[in-house]
């Protein structure tokens, strides 16, 4: 029956109990034998004699091993040997998150009249964009020294790529590559601010509506400002027209620069045209959804949401020689001939730089 046996003697029933300590003794003997056999394969710190006490030789071996590892890592104690590296990295992340939450909850941050929130920008937006900048598009920047360290300046760049990744990469390039780590304030189409979540994030990143009045206010305040004069004509052009600049509007950006005496810096971006190669624009669907264009690319809409992932083209951003406006008269901002000539000069500079960058490119994805 497993626990005992029952005997019947002349009508009397007696139970013979089998002592369990007999089996326990046998099991313990087998375990001790196994320990002696496997002991040679265990770490010295796990070895012990039958009475559970470590020998002096075993303890000395463990101490020597710890001392050797401590000397090789430069640690001063056992805690540093075992936990310092992983915990310091984890502690940095925890401290960063805790610091961000504390400042947001206590209101210990500032927002300017345009909605620019430097604290949110540095903690959330820029770290997210750096993955695309460094690992996905592998952006190379040249001519960053042409941007002033202080004071207002207007960066004028070509626009392409269906979605405005070029503006995001340009703003990050200025902050991360410029010695002064300046904030670049983009002039953005008003439709963007009507988008849920996106519009609020764009304002927190320091950008504002693309209009002459806002451009004038930013430049007059000494802000580094960027404009894409091609607008939707450049952003939504077909792949066959890549790197061919579209018309630069009516020259409103030149008027703002002339009236504030701000320096104009031409900027050429190569790589943005290939992230969403637009084969055609379905205008009927664009009108139906109320958007400037409805792109058809090799992956969108055929691949569904996967088609929204930009292709990892190799990018180059080149800042050209600055064009100074200090020698222009105050009335030149209202002179159509002056604004037209200056607009054409900026446009031609960007176009020729694009041709030069393309001539030195061997591969779309590897540069």
UniProtKB/Swiss-Prot annotation:
Transmembrane segments: none annotated. One of its GO terms (cellular component) is membrane. SUPFAM superfamilies: Glycerol-3-phosphate (1)-acyltransferase. One of its GO terms (molecular function) is acyltransferase activity. Pfam families: Acyltransferase (PF01553). To M.tuberculosis Rv0502. This is Uncharacterized protein ML2427.
